[in-house]
Amino acid sequence: MARLSSLLSFSLALLTFLHGSTAQQFPNECQLDQLNALEPSHVLKAEAGRIEVWDHHAPQLRCSGVSFVRYIIESKGLYLPSFFSTARLSFVAKGEGLMGRVVLCAETFQDSSVFQPSGGSPFGEGQGQGQQGQGQGHQGQGQGQQGQQGQQGQQSQGQGFRDMHQKVEHIRTGDTIATHPGVAQWFYNDGNQPLVIVSVLDLASHQNQLDRNPRPFYLAGNNPQGQVWIEGREQQPQKNILNGFTPEVLAKAFKIDVRTAQQLQNQQDNRGNIIRVQGPFSVIRPPLRSQRPQEEVNGLEETICSARCTDNLDDPSNADVYKPQLGYISTLNSYDLPILRFLRLSALRGSIRQNAMVLPQWNANANAVLYVTDGEAHVQVVNDNGDRVFDGQVSQGQLLSIPQGFSVVKRATSEQFRWIEFKTNANAQINTLAGRTSVLRGLPLEVISNGYQISLEEARRVKFNTIETTLTHSSGPASYGGPRKADA
């Protein structure tokens, strides 16, 4: 009995220690008395673009447990495939292009419409040009057709089989892209203007088994400037992961000659991680998303191979809050994009006109990182001590981190203010201070009157004068002349 009691005591002590070491890895990191609008601290230049990195050691980003990166890809620029050890949520701030991800699934895009799989073909999962293969539905149509299929397979192989690869998607301004840890991803700019993509990396995620440093793993190319993301590390050129293996091992693994294996290592390549494509970029391109019918999905049928990873937040007709004279706000969570349930991230897109204001609110269960894509706004943020830790302008290209529970209000000071917020919860929730669904609206008048030492009539005005839920005008106090029609 004594032995059992000692074992239980040891187990409880161990659990307490492990929980404490995890939860308090960075003690007092969120005792912030000042926030700042942040700019990139490092720039990695490449042949056809650049990668701009924010300092994730900045106190407000360290509190949120995230890192932030901006990719600027020039026309005909190809961001070479890479992966991170963290979950990543990206937003296309400008431009259009192509995106590919590689997960542990068979290739589903094939560029030869005449190809039919024969019995001994290694490409038995082919489904035709630009189509996705989901199983073995086209692997034979009965015993009587096997001979014909074999002949077709031999004919097509004689004609030459060009390529098959995993899914490629068109991306455009407003797209939000979710990416699992360890999933290789590439981008190509097939437009005429720069393709700008911003990404948040959840360093504090349970899926990141390394330290709180963003670590890109490159499958191709080299980074001559080294890993500027990791503080204290001597900046040596960062090579792709194939460079670490001997050419002989690569030759055996890929069934190629040693010379080709050496080329895979990119040892003499100083173009960086964004290279310029010479000539046409021939990949299998699916129909544009606007040409495909909208389908109702519940996420239950999705697998890692078929899961949607992209959704567009720039369509006002799909907004959660829309007022033509003020603007709109759209949210993206795991109900809209089920993959976010595993990433434990979500996003909010806002676009408001001059003098429109987002009513004071706080994130109940998430940290938020606000990135300005267009225009300017005046923002105030208040911490748990009731101190105003930020009171100033934010403008295009700047970043502001808003910790959980910190109250924030935004007012557009330019003709239009647009931003994207990344949040560290798959279903982030907000509470408002003013408005129809606010915390003060839910309190009894007596509580408001006694709590703020105001009359019942003043308490009634505090509680009921603002009938909007999210967006309102900031040009002056509301009119008290009569009832107003409630809207968003």
Swiss-Prot record:
Residues 1-23 form the signal peptide. InterPro entries: 11S_seedstore_CS, 11S_seedstore_pln, Cupin_1, RmlC-like_jellyroll, RmlC_Cupin_sf, Seed_Storage-Functional. Residues 121-147 have a biased composition (Gly residues). Gene3D superfamilies: Jelly Rolls (2.60.120.10). GO terms for biological process: seed maturation. Residues 35-262, 311-460 form the Cupin type-1 domain. The keyword Amino-acid biosynthesis does not apply. Disulfide bonds join C30-C63, C105-C305. It is found in: Rough endoplasmic reticulum. One of its GO terms (cellular component) is rough endoplasmic reticulum. Keywords: Disulfide bond, Endoplasmic reticulum, Seed storage protein, Signal, Storage protein. It holds the Pfam family Cupin_1. Coiled coil: none annotated. The keyword Acetylation does not apply. One of its GO terms (molecular function) is nutrient reservoir activity. Residues 148-160 have a biased composition (Low complexity). Residues 116-163 are annotated as: Disordered. Hexamer; each subunit is composed of an acidic and a basic chain derived from a single precursor and linked by a disulfide bond. PANTHER family: 12S SEED STORAGE PROTEIN CRA1 (PTHR31189:SF30), OS03G0336100 PROTEIN-RELATED (PTHR31189). Belongs to the 11S seed storage protein (globulins) family. This is a seed storage protein. This is Cruciferin.
